[in-house]
Amino acid sequence: MSFAKFSYDETTHNQVVNHPRAHENTLRGIEYLQKQGIFTSVNMVISQANFDHLYQTGVFVSNLGVESFSTAQAIPSQAGGKSHLQQALTPEQIPEYLEALHHIREDTGMFVKLTNPVPFCSVWESRPHLRYLLETSTCTAGRTIIQIDPSGQVKPCPMINNGYGNILEEGLDVVWQRMTPWSDNAYVPETCQPCDLVERCRGGCRAEAERTCGSLAAKNPFSIKPVKLSPIQEPNHNLPIGTKMVVTRNLRARKEQADLYVLFTKDRYMVTRENVARFISAIHTKGSLTIDEKLAQDRGAIETLALAYNAGILRKAA
């Protein structure tokens, strides 16, 4: 179960939620579920009201025993007017925001991810060690997710106001076909088309672009410029010699088809080939894997370990 936590600080959390006992009630709920053996995670929406609280909040919830921490930059609502726009992050804050989340992972060992996408170009070239965070979230609106309200009205995502019909009256097939522009990337900005990352990034959050720039197809305010990938990519990981890797608790595997497996546990998963699944299974059987000089020279093995680590399937031992 996921809990919303807006700050480690009781006063700030209560102010954002607008309830005098919100902090107390949230902590009580986390503690109760943990005692029942139920997995708990925390999501933090980041705005100007709590931007400086991110790192300390991550450490705070880790000390509560939370194993998974996600964040999302606040998306201004259309009803909120200028006051909501003033709470949105600035382009200059995005690198600092991602750095804080990265340090939470490095310092606590928690699995971290984004729940609102950030344009990949925002830090792809300037801070390559943050690329894994960008890849934890992309726009899935009308592609792999839809929102259905209690009356059956369908939207491509909770933050998009455009309706596409009623699933109870017309059925899923009819409504789904109306959302074809989303799967066809019709709202990906023209300025993003030359980018080598466009199929993975899709221009960032379209609701964010609409609220701040006026159109679903507008350039996201955090976009910088198209990225051109080098044929030879430099290694992008933080797994130095001496790093001890262990398999995340309660990891399970499911065979999807020949030579294709899904490794999953709690709120994370990794789709991979059989040889990688066996490699990770061997780490689990052995108990751990320590990166030595020989292994560090095996780029393929290190990249596999980095992928599994970034997906939350492996973690660094304390």
Give the predicted meaning of each segment:
Residues 131, 177-180, 260, 269, ...:
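N-terminal [4Fe-4S]-dependent radical SAM core
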Residues 2-151, 155-159:
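Radical SAM enzyme [4Fe-4S]-AdoMet core and its adjacent flexible, acidic
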Residues 208-225:
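Short cysteine/histidine-rich metal-coordination sites, predominantly Zn2+-binding motifs
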Residues 220-250:
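Short Fe-S-cluster ligation motifs
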Residues 143, 149-151, 192, 202, ...:
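Active-site lining segments that contact anionic ligands and/or coordinate catalytic metals
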